Amino acid sequence: MKKFGTYLVYVLAFAFIMLAFACGTIAFAELGYSAVLAFIFGYAFALLSMYLIFILHELGHAFCGYLTGYRLVAFGLGHFLLTKKSGRFHLSRTAVLKNVGAQYIGLKEDESDQRIILMLSGGLLVHLSLILLAILFGFLTKSWYFAGTWIFLNLSFFLNNTLPVGITDGAKIWELRQHPENTKYAYMVLRHSAQTLLAPQGYDLKDFIMPVDEDARGSFAESVQTLQGLVFILDDNIELAKQQFQSVLEKTDNLMSKTISQLYLLQIALIEGDNKKAEEYASIRGVKSFLSIKTADMQVIQAWYQFKVKKDVVQTHKAMKIAKQKMDSSRMLRDEKGYYENWLAELEKELTEGV
């Protein structure tokens, strides 16, 4: 029943997107444009509106974060990230997960403040406000097709973001309402994300782990557990790492937690030389998506996979080249960067000896 409800929401959200683009086209057709121009201008209007709404959504998080004591660290749209360091903004390109259109990262100064849900609700409040403004615009101007574009776009984004699945705002809000004790894990995850941008070489990954209650549930607790698992890998405690990720896999129903655990179990299989297990994990759709991300850590894993499992030297060199290019710009902390640099050097040595 839960899956049916989820699919129904996805179908409705997609239908609203289609209606938004249709409204945009009809709006320009009513202005007297030919069918072709109306379609082009309508499509462009809807597309630009989408990107503007993405920005407004993240600004909603930033505004509610400001009200509750968050310091702006980064604000991104697509591959572009605006990071605030020492009072100045710096623009850079970054790798993003698929389906992540924009992002806001804030750092909480007072972690005893429990109003994190207000910050997480900022984007949803923006969508509701924009729907009301679009309706008001429609009444005032009678341009209901232009208004309809924004109404349907915001309805679609609101539905997608309220759905308590994966890494949506709705999933995070639902988790913290069900498990308010997970707030401490949420702040740890936010602190980790912020420092990977502010001072990545001033911290180690082990600085962002903490004990997690055995019966803890939810993506924030699981994120801290996966960070602990990665620390085990960095410290060469492979058996402990394997147990940690398998434990997360067994109890989670969060797709992101599951995929990250499978990704690092792939890395462990490569370290242990278990090619069959590595092939099994690498064939998982979510893991494939991560391996396509152009960051140093993902491309080092990709290179080892191509070398040891696929025996594809061309793809191995391609992944290694990307890893070298992205080593300094990838959001890795000091011990992570050192580990993947050494693992890449080890692969280069094996390739040289093989030749």
Regions found by a protein language model. Name each.
Residues 319-355:
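Terminal, low-structured helical/coil segments at or just beyond the last alpha-helical repeat
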Residues 108-198:
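Hydrophobic transmembrane alpha-helical segments that form the core helix bundle
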Residues 226-236, 246-310:
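Alpha-helical adaptor scaffolds
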Residues 1-46:
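Topogenic membrane-insertion module of multi-pass membrane proteins
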Residues 44-108:
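Small-residue-rich helix-interface/hinge motifs
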Residues 220, 253, 257-260, 294-295, ...:
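Structural signature of alpha-solenoid helical repeat junctions
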Residues 67, 104-110, 165-233, 240, ...:
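Polar-ligand-bearing catalytic/cofactor-coordination segments
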Residues 203-215, 238-250, 274-289, 312-326, ...:
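Alpha-helical repeat scaffolds
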